[in-house]
Amino acid sequence: MVVPDKVRSATFPVHVETQALADGVWLLGGASHNSVAVEFEDFIAVVEAPLDEERNLAVIEEVVRLVPNKPIRFLVNTHQHHDHIGGLRTYMHIGATIITHWKNFDFYNRDVLNYAPWTLSPDMVSLWPPTELAEGYQYETIRENYWLNNGTRSMHISYVHPLTHVE
């Protein structure tokens, strides 16, 4: 069977639907998976980097539109399944610290958040590998509880266990 060129080169636009949940908190939907952006005094935290780089570049673009002039400093990752880690390298490349459970650390270091090129569908890290690490941490691993706080807003992140889905 020969795949027609139009089918092989088809692109599918990524659409991000934004819903304000509270002052400075947005649901970024429009696909099978969602992200949440939380505005702090001098940075943004995003929860979840699902699917693939294209989806996450669209989410990042929407966050920049919503909150210009504040960096995305943190990406909170809920678990290690492929549909939840597709954009982790994208956030790593823009200098965000990845917050995840400590059980994910070895897998992410070995297979995901490294500078090895992705050859089937090259991402930003593959195409433009950094010459040096971004300022700040690459990871924050948590065991039970973690707080992001800047004095005016606090976000509490908890490890909910036991959930066999994410173990």
Regions found by a protein language model. Give the residues of each.
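Conserved beta-strand hairpin/beta-sheet module of binuclear metal-dependent hydrolase folds
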Residues: 19-65, 158, 167
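Active-site metal-binding motif and surrounding structural segment of the metallo-beta-lactamase
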Residues: 43, 54-99
